[in-house]
Amino acid sequence: MPTDNDPILVTCGLPYANGPAHIGHLRTYVPADIFVRALRRMGHDVLFICGSDAHGTPIVVNAESRGMSPRELVEFYHKHFEDVFRSINVRFDYFGCTDDPSNHHRTQEIVRALMERGHVYPKEIELAYCPRCERFLPDRYVEGICPYCGVPARGDECDQGCGRHLEPGEIKDAVCKVCGTRAEYRKQTHYFFRLSAFREFLLDYLQRLGGTASARNYALEWVRQELKDWCITRNMSWGVKFPGSEDLVVYVWVDAPIGYISFTEEWCKAHGVPWERYWRGKSRIIHFIGGDIVYHHCIFWPAMLEGAGYTLPSDVVASGMLKIDDKKFSKSRGYVVWVKDDYLDQGLEPDYLRYYLASYTSHTKEVNFSWKILQEKVNTELVGAFGNFLNRAVTFAVKNFDGKVPEGELDPEVMKRIEMSVGDVSSSLMEYEFKRASDAVLSLADYANTYFQSHEPWKLIRSDRRAAGSVLRNCLQMVKAMIILMEPFMPSRMAVAWKQLGMESLDDIQFRDAVQPIPEGHPLGTPKILFSRIEDSTVKRLEEIFRERVRRAEGAGEKVKEKPVIPFDQFKALDLRVGTVLEAERIKGSDKLLRLIVDIGEKRQIVAGIAKMYKPEELVGRQVVVVANLEPVKIFGVESRGMLLAADINGDAVLLKPDKEVPAGCGIR
């Protein structure tokens, strides 16, 4: 196991080079950057790695629709993300791309190692094939029905229902996404990773995994069920070639996380450091990811690393999801805030957004982004508390003590309070509690404001100049501490604040320096307003941009995809009934599924993928429409004997119900 003296490698889930950055992306990258900056302020040896995810069917489909090559599309968005990260002060030590030669090489090396150790085997399977396009349909090239929960799904994932990863050939009623033709099924040989053989290893490993409990518990729920072997090849030309085959590439979720290793190699090569220090030694590897890719990082990835003989991640830190104005995040419905167009290009301070994302709520909980809440947090917490105290303290010292730190004793109570704040911030960040850490800095600012007000230096200066000097030296000591502790959250603004104390650079400053006495007679810089208020007119303008996007999305709508005509007798075979929900509860380990007991003339247990739209308590007593004669299926280990009918509004489920209450079990015709 790694110790406190071992090197630390921090990675972020790779941004997919298929579209622009939105603030949901930053929910992963900003906290990771804060964490890395804090580690360095605590004296740790840390390397910060990321890069663009360049492969997979969505990129190929998007590139084809634009009349460009996948590589051209990837290069465009790779640069876009580099620019956004630079602007938002996320500073990776290395930002690579999974289509770089080094990642092709490392991926093939790992796959060969897995094959040599007997963890990969060939198997003939049936795959969706489009007779019109004359090609096999991997992943996002095909849509159909999830075989586990019966809702519409993508070829590789049941994104609207049970959340399962779908293996090639599993999806039912497959349709080509390109031309809409019903797919045929044809046999072909593919390669599988023996994931099932790693079940006991994963159960033990996940019990020890650090990071957020949400990631660990979610993965454990999956592993406790049956683990199926994992198809790791696809019929595509874009990607990393599978060793020994010209027709197959490795699945994107094989080569994407291997990017963490190849990017580390590239940085190490440039700095004369052996890459094995991080991936074959006693290092601490910490993955920051979005909550939607826990399955891949906590199950597939550690099993591959164990199978190939690499160092395992010690922590997986999964963020909560994002809402926009209390609405579910949705690009198609317009509920999105683009980092460049909607924030940076509007002239807003990057550090404000960093502070918002870190301080709004606990890292694992859902963040609601709103321009009004941003305004309130900036104007109240940053301008009113933090900035107000800093400006008053520095301005008073400059005006009344010749622009220098006055002479005077440092109050033991003040120093104790600073020391407590350093401890609170450090421990909170090491536990990935970013809000708790930022709250600790704001608490010190509140204490400092109270100290300044209660000691009334503006009166004291007239009667006891030395006593007033002592008050101001203590205030400036607290300013110093606040800047050092807030730097990981707002690096640009704190660099400006640091110069107001007459200091040059924060680069080599440690958290422990917050309690080092500020020297008497030290020349101060020029006081300036650190934070500017966000005015009502700005909020109004930004909200109008957002509302216009929603209006355009609603006006455009999505064309309804017509399905093949079916015989009336096929429709008559459905047993549709009105049911009344008697019980509802969340299914442990899933953020999408609810377990319901529904009265349909008899009590039925039904699993429904509606947890993101409905709270369990809202459903009890509600009438619903049920398909009652479906074969029972197990979803997330829970038997489901029926399915609720719902409208699909851009991915949101809206339950159907009769326009007036009818007896439970009433048939529908």
Curated annotation (Swiss-Prot):
<feature type="binding site">
    <location>
        <position position="331"/>
    </location>
    <ligand>
        <name>ATP</name>
    </ligand>
</feature>
<dbReference type="GO" id="GO:0000049">
    <property type="term" value="F:tRNA binding"/>
</dbReference>
<dbReference type="GO" id="GO:0046872">
    <property type="term" value="F:metal ion binding"/>
</dbReference>
<dbReference type="InterPro" id="IPR009080">
    <property type="entry name" value="tRNAsynth_Ia_anticodon-bd"/>
</dbReference>
<keyword id="KW-0862">Zinc</keyword>
<dbReference type="InterPro" id="IPR014758">
    <property type="entry name" value="Met-tRNA_synth"/>
</dbReference>
<feature type="domain" description="tRNA-binding">
    <location>
        <begin position="570"/>
        <end position="669"/>
    </location>
</feature>
<protein>
    <recommendedName>
        <fullName>Methionine--tRNA ligase</fullName>
        <ecNumber>6.1.1.10</ecNumber>
    </recommendedName>
</protein>
<dbReference type="InterPro" id="IPR012340">
    <property type="entry name" value="NA-bd_OB-fold"/>
</dbReference>
<keyword id="KW-0436">Ligase</keyword>
<dbReference type="GO" id="GO:0006431">
    <property type="term" value="P:methionyl-tRNA aminoacylation"/>
</dbReference>
<feature type="binding site">
    <location>
        <position position="149"/>
    </location>
    <ligand>
        <name>Zn(2+)</name>
    </ligand>
</feature>
<dbReference type="GO" id="GO:0005829">
    <property type="term" value="C:cytosol"/>
</dbReference>
<dbReference type="GO" id="GO:0005524">
    <property type="term" value="F:ATP binding"/>
</dbReference>
<keyword id="KW-0820">tRNA-binding</keyword>
<dbReference type="InterPro" id="IPR014729">
    <property type="entry name" value="Rossmann-like_a/b/a_fold"/>
</dbReference>
<dbReference type="InterPro" id="IPR041872">
    <property type="entry name" value="Anticodon_Met"/>
</dbReference>
<comment type="similarity">
    <text>Belongs to the class-I aminoacyl-tRNA synthetase family. MetG type 1 subfamily.</text>
</comment>
<dbReference type="InterPro" id="IPR002547">
    <property type="entry name" value="tRNA-bd_dom"/>
</dbReference>
<dbReference type="Pfam" id="PF09334">
    <property type="entry name" value="tRNA-synt_1g"/>
</dbReference>
<dbReference type="InterPro" id="IPR015413">
    <property type="entry name" value="Methionyl/Leucyl_tRNA_Synth"/>
</dbReference>
<dbReference type="Pfam" id="PF01588">
    <property type="entry name" value="tRNA_bind"/>
</dbReference>
<comment type="function">
    <text>Is required not only for elongation of protein synthesis but also for the initiation of all mRNA translation through initiator tRNA(fMet) aminoacylation.</text>
</comment>
<feature type="short sequence motif" description="'KMSKS' region">
    <location>
        <begin position="328"/>
        <end position="332"/>
    </location>
</feature>
<feature type="binding site">
    <location>
        <position position="146"/>
    </location>
    <ligand>
        <name>Zn(2+)</name>
    </ligand>
</feature>
<keyword id="KW-0963">Cytoplasm</keyword>
<dbReference type="InterPro" id="IPR023458">
    <property type="entry name" value="Met-tRNA_ligase_1"/>
</dbReference>
<dbReference type="GO" id="GO:0017101">
    <property type="term" value="C:aminoacyl-tRNA synthetase multienzyme complex"/>
</dbReference>
<dbReference type="InterPro" id="IPR033911">
    <property type="entry name" value="MetRS_core"/>
</dbReference>
<keyword id="KW-0479">Metal-binding</keyword>
<comment type="subunit">
    <text>Homodimer.</text>
</comment>
<dbReference type="InterPro" id="IPR029038">
    <property type="entry name" value="MetRS_Zn"/>
</dbReference>
<feature type="binding site">
    <location>
        <position position="158"/>
    </location>
    <ligand>
        <name>Zn(2+)</name>
    </ligand>
</feature>
<dbReference type="GO" id="GO:0004825">
    <property type="term" value="F:methionine-tRNA ligase activity"/>
</dbReference>
<keyword id="KW-0648">Protein biosynthesis</keyword>
<keyword id="KW-0067">ATP-binding</keyword>
<dbReference type="InterPro" id="IPR004495">
    <property type="entry name" value="Met-tRNA-synth_bsu_C"/>
</dbReference>
<keyword id="KW-0547">Nucleotide-binding</keyword>
<feature type="binding site">
    <location>
        <position position="162"/>
    </location>
    <ligand>
        <name>Zn(2+)</name>
    </ligand>
</feature>
<feature type="short sequence motif" description="'HIGH' region">
    <location>
        <begin position="15"/>
        <end position="25"/>
    </location>
</feature>
<dbReference type="Pfam" id="PF19303">
    <property type="entry name" value="Anticodon_3"/>
</dbReference>
<keyword id="KW-0694">RNA-binding</keyword>
